[in-house]
Design a protein with these regions (language model features):
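Bacterial N-terminal signal peptides
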Residues: 16-27
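A short, structured surface patch at a secondary-structure boundary
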Residues: 55-113, 117-122
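N-terminal secretory signal peptides that target proteins for export/translocation
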Residues: 1-11
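Short helix-initiation/N-cap motifs at beta->coil->alpha
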Residues: 42-44, 97-108, 228-237
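Proline-aspartate-enriched helix->loop->beta-strand connector
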Residues: 106-123, 138, 236-253
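A ligand-binding cleft/hinge motif common to bilobed small-molecule-binding domains
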Residues: 124-135, 252-273
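Alpha-helical, coiled-coil/dimerization segments enriched in small aliphatic residues
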Residues: 85, 210-232
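Extracytoplasmic substrate-binding proteins
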Residues: 32, 36-39, 46, 117, ...
Length: 351
């Protein structure tokens, strides 16, 4: 007689099948997690994250925005004073315990919170952050999250670390599509207006290596400082006049722009620039082509909105096909969960 057992294996009962499915579901997170996880930080170093973080200390505003994008603010246990001082923008994050300044935090306060990961900028604080926290078993991950060339990789890495890959992918898909459309439109314009790009300090020009330089280039402009060897350099008024910029872009340090704490700030900055001695000789000043942009919007995770504003300003011929307000609105409402408001850009109309 033939043995039919191999053709008709015993079936699992409903209760046994349910139990098996439950075990598989419980095992799935363990199978998906690939820890320790090695990622490249903002300094190009390999950093090992030993396990999926459940308690984060956030020293960077850009990283705090990234947590909102990834729907992971519940993991934060400590923030800097700069975040605590602006509850209108930061919401519940501003109510978390303080660990001091973003560039010189209180390391004892960090240790007391028992974080399993600290996220800070690439350059600041200094190496003492790792030196003091490493003996306590607290890893430090340095992510700038404000440079176009590395923003996508850093967001993807943070999404993997926190188990928020889907949220990271949704943001990156939007970010890439927005920038691709802008680059296509300004590429068709066929012109690259000469731009004098000034950092937060007067006559401190932003060159290669600065976040704003990358954004200006993405907006289809020729940065007059693109041949300089350092990200920021001091220049003279004579240098600017001789360079004959067609447009001027001035970055202003974050001043609680979301709540528009000082509506007159950006107009005042622009007025002072136009009144500089000798600047009336430049094409930019003669034509009133001066734009002031707040760092609250860019550079950072909202870079696509900042590039949209810069491109529409620099290329009037295609401005009607670029809607900076729409890009900004989607960033604020869809990804940060905020209302569509703020004073971020001023180029001669209402902020």
């Amino acid at each position: 007689m033939k043995n039919h057992a191999t053709r008709n294996p015993p079936r699992l009962g409903r209760s046994a099948l349910a139990a098996l499915l439950c075990l598989l579901c419980l095992a799935a997170p363990a199978l998906a997690a690939d820890f320790p996880l090695a990622v490249t930080d903002a300094k190009g170093r390999q950093v090992s994250v030993p396990r999926r973080p459940q308690r984060l200390v956030v020293l960077s505003g850009n990283a705090a925005d990234a947590l909102r994008i990834l729907r992971a603010t519940d993991l934060a246990t400590g923030v800097t004073e700069r975040i605590r001082e602006n509850p209108v923008y930061w919401g519940s994050l501003a109510a978390l315990p303080s660990v001091g300044k973003w560039n010189s935090p209180n390391l004892e306060a960090i240790a007391a919170l028992r974080p399993d990961l600290v996220i800070g900028y690439g350059a600041n604080p200094g190496p003492e952050l790792e030196e003091r926290l490493a003996p306590l078993g607290i890893p430090v991950l340095r992510l700038d999250l404000h440079r176009l060339h590395s923003l996508e990789a850093e967001m993807a890495d943070l999404g993997r670390i926190l188990g928020r890959e889907a949220e990271a992918s949704a943001y990156l898909e939007w970010h890439r599509a927005a920038l691709a459309r802008i680059r296509d439109l300004v590429g068709r314009a066929g012109t690259r207006p000469r731009a004098y790009v000034e950092g937060y300090s007067d006559f401190r020009v932003a060159g290669p290596g600065s976040g704003i330089d990358e954004m200006v280039r993405a907006a289809g402009c020729l940065n007059l400082a693109e041949t300089m060897a350092i990200p920021f350099a001091e220049v003279t008024p004579e240098w600017v006049v001789a360079a004959a910029p067609q447009i001027v872009i001035k970055a202003v340090s974050g001043q609680r722009s979301y709540e528009c704490a000082d509506p007159g700030l950006l107009p005042r900055v622009r007025e002072r620039i136009l009144a500089r001695p000798g600047w009336s000789l430049t094409p930019a000043a003669r034509d009133g082509r001066v734009l002031v942009i707040a760092s609250d919007l860019c550079p950072g995770t909202g870079a696509a909105a900042g590039v949209a504003h810069l491109a529409a300003f620099a290329h009037p011929e295609v401005a009607g096909r670029i809607d900076p307000g729409a890009v900004q609105r989607e960033y604020l409402t869809r990804f940060l969960g905020l209302a569509d408001q703020g004073c971020y850009v001023f180029a001669g109309a209402r902020p």
